[in-house]
Curated annotation (Swiss-Prot):
Binds 1 FAD per subunit. FAD binds at residues 8-12, 34-35, 77-78, 302, 322, 391. The active site is at residues 160, 356. This is Sulfide-quinone reductase. It catalyses: n a quinone + n hydrogen sulfide + n H(+) = polysulfur(n-2) + n a quinol. Catalyzes the oxidation of hydrogen sulfide, with the help of a quinone. Consecutive reaction cycles lead to the accumulation of a polysulfide product on the active site Cys residues; these products are released when they exceed a critical length, typically as cyclooctasulfur. It is found in: Membrane. Changing residue 132 to A: No effect on FAD reduction. Reduced activity with decylubiquinone. The lineage of its organism: Bacteria, Pseudomonadati, Pseudomonadota, Acidithiobacillia, Acidithiobacillales. It is a peripheral membrane protein. It comes from Acidithiobacillus ferrooxidans (strain ATCC 23270 / DSM 14882 / CIP 104768 / NCIMB 8455). GO terms for biological process: aerobic electron transport chain. GO terms for cellular component: membrane. Keywords: FAD, Flavoprotein, Membrane, Nucleotide-binding, Oxidoreductase, Quinone.
Amino acid sequence: MAHVVILGAGTGGMPAAYEMKEALGSGHEVTLISANDYFQFVPSNPWVGVGWKERDDIAFPIRHYVERKGIHFIAQSAEQIDAEAQNITLADGNTVHYDYLMIATGPKLAFENVPGSDPHEGPVQSICTVDHAERAFAEYQALLREPGPIVIGAMAGASCFGPAYEYAMIVASDLKKRGMRDKIPSFTFITSEPYIGHLGIQGVGDSKGILTKGLKEEGIEAYTNCKVTKVEDNKMYVTQVDEKGETIKEMVLPVKFGMMIPAFKGVPAVAGVEGLCNPGGFVLVDEHQRSKKYANIFAAGIAIAIPPVETTPVPTGAPKTGYMIESMVSAAVHNIKADLEGRKGEQTMGTWNAVCFADMGDRGAAFIALPQLKPRKVDVFAYGRWVHLAKVAFEKYFIRKMKMGVSEPFYEKVLFKMMGITRLKEEDTHRKAS
């Protein structure tokens, strides 16, 4: 009997645990380890940040749901991974031995890159976790009591730009509903992207035109090619550069309320494993999600290293979105199962297809990129009220999946396949490893 450990219980790790247990059955043991004892649906955090959703709407305790599927659950943070001995040391000092390890930890938020940008230090908030989103809402309520300048956007090195656009548009929409939009003296969007709608992936469809128009309609002044150097005394210090990376403007923006997506790094326990990660702490994997150094370690989601799609004047990263992450998870599960069944030569690849819904207040933006990284076979970006409704429905659907203990229900698989969207490169399912 082999012991497979999933490290991390987010939108990658929790589906991975369910899918792994379903694939391996009772003949092998599956353990899920998470620093949190609850699951949170991170894509809904922008709503929490303005009070449109509460914590209990998007988060729930993990243990009951995974243990009834025969998955062992440990609510402890991993402090160290000994890849040679195949042991994980937990925060309480206990160790867990594994035969196979799948890393799905998500990121460490690199607030230290920009002095004063930590939500606990000043006016700039984060919505990367539900805890941060709740704090952002508390600060937003303070803004409503005493209006002032708003700055929202993404830091240099950020890779998850969608939520920045979402939150900016949602805040603008909420202010209008409250009759307070005209009380905000300035509303600024600051991004490290070379142009609006780049999204870290050279844009999708007409994302540039649609998002530029959306920000303009809301009266939000946008600046691209920007890096925030520090936040101090309710001021944000920003440097804007040209196409060659040369400084063209230094700005000091007043900020009563802000939200900036930080750059990501790998979590310390993972980043500290010799030869496992790149300098940023992200796991170096091959096209089958397997570590390039350790054959029994796999990784999926934000935890893996994906090079930027292009060199930009201000550093930007490539995002790892929901369906793309599920694609990675499915490939890793297939390959671990093949190993355990003595079929180590058979390798499966994920498609890395991306389907994303972003709420923009009373409207929304959706994109389908097959695959997410260019060159693409499908490249569509759409905008309208239907996307807002679709995201509301998807949140409820995904949370229900996680409570039911199913990674990919058959009807989801059939429906997506009819649309030409699959998790795995089926033609490579039995591809022989070179």
